[in-house]
């Protein structure tokens, strides 16, 4: 494989050479090349190509040989994170160390080689189709709209009929989604047939999130409590973007909401990232929630 597609060489290419490489890849894989863009976040950076296909935006992520997994702190936690963990340990009567506790939920340390790839820049919700409120498939069910009016009168922000339809308040109006349930194998096949794409493996997902960093989070060994985080907003955060949802050093919006399980490739249904909100809903706080 072309060594220029791997990060050590890719990062040293002249912009003119990188531009030619990206245009060549776009032609080969039937993508529309948009531009070169420099992404920088949390001490890592990558100037790479942005592409488009079928209304989706993709980014080229160079490959690399990296260390994944976690077993111990590199920098150590600050006082705020230590105190948050100590309170939780006292509540659950845990007497071991923070590293021992966290290690239980981590994959083992290993060296892996990740191949270069095109990656969709944003998470996509599976099985839900965004539709206008006047879509015939919505208006054909006046009972849905009647129930929605009842919920709206109670100042509710959302209304969902299981595996059928979902409505969410959008300012003074509402947005609608229709549900199209599918199995994990069906989704994998649809990716292959419709996009000639696949889900990332768990190792690829970890690389896309952390780039091979050795700290607990991409920015360090503790949660930055100055960040605006989903499910832990306060009044001062109004109008600000969610920090972890902003593009990372590869230009990806990934692993930013503990309520969202992110599908990865496996023989059976496999997810990374969020736990469906179990820790957050269970009162474990932002650190263990994320």
Q: Which positions does each model-derived feature cover?
A:
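Functional-site microenvironments in short loops/helix caps that host divalent-cation chemistry
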Residues: 166-285
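Extended beta-strand/loop cores of jelly-roll/beta-sandwich
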Residues: 1-198
